[in-house]
């Protein structure tokens, strides 16, 4: 099934509020970013028989509980498993199945702008925004099974509209469906899958020095992919995900200063997005 429903969660009251489905697009394997006032969803798959990527997007306003379809003029090709980052004033869409473009969407003017592309086709990759650059890494360039990951990456400079490559020296092994967070000075890559084998390794990338440092595997979470990961301001929290047989309801906290892991409190919740 492909759904067009959702809900807003209030952590203060611990309550859920259903969202309007009027003009809400049905999809999965899409992207979503938060602008500060609205959520923008874009792309994804809107039909399972056959699998049909789309280039339809919409903006959701939680105050008015309304959806607004965004412009298709100069929009990226229909795609899924792409990446999206919010720059502070625009959403950048990169890659995806059948899409070798990089484009920027301005929600104020409802317009798309074509950006320079990295020249590397990739999907099921990760992407982060540093404040002035977008770093994309990993993923795959083939839909063949088992999925073979890549361990290349690119750094997009929004000011100069140019790309540079991330070094392969000490880079993590090839993978798809890994997590990535930005610490303020480094991107931390962790987990993922390559040829149906999940892993529990990671690395920190410094875009200033273009250098990788491997993160410890001691006491790390069990090998997994399609998990969630956030940066708290001092630690990376890894949660959920799964391997080929099991979904997980556990996680750990990683401290880059000590290069160590600590347990995260368990909850009775399995969070796993199987790609």
Residue ranges and their predicted role:
Residues 1-275:
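Kelch-like beta-propeller repeat domains
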């Amino acid at each position: 099934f492909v759904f067009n429903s959702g809900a807003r969660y209030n952590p203060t009251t611990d309550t859920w509020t259903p969202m309007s489905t009027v003009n809400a697009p049905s999809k999965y394997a899409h992207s979503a970013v938060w602008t500060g006032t609205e959520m923008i969803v874009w792309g994804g798959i809107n039909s399972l028989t056959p699998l049909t990527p789309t280039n339809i997007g919409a903006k959701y306003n939680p105050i008015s509980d309304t959806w607004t379809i965004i412009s298709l003029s100069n929009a990226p090709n229909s795609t899924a498993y792409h990446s999206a980052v919010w720059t502070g004033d625009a959403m950048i869409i990169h890659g995806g199945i059948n899409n070798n473009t990089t484009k920027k969407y301005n929600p104020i003017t409802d317009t798309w702008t074509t950006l320079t592309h990295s020249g590397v086709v990739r999907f099921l990759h990760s992407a982060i925004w540093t404040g002035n650059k977008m770093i994309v890494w990993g993923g795959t360039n083939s839909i063949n099974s088992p999925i073979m990951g890549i361990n290349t990456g690119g750094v997009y400079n929004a000011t100069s509209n140019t790309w540079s490559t991330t070094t392969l020296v000490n880079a993590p092994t090839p993978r798809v469906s890994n997590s990535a967070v930005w610490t303020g000075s480094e991107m931390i890559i962790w987990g993922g899958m390559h040829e149906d084998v999940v892993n529990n390794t990671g690395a920190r990338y410094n875009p200033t020095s273009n250098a990788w440092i491997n993160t410890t595997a001691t006491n790390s979470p069990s090998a997994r992919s399609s998990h969630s990961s956030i940066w708290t301001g001092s630690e990376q929290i890894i949660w959920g995900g799964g391997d080929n047989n099991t979904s997980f309801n556990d996680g750990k906290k990683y401290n880059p200063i000590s290069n160590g892991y600590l347990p995260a409190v368990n909850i009775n919740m399995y969070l796993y997005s199987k790609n």
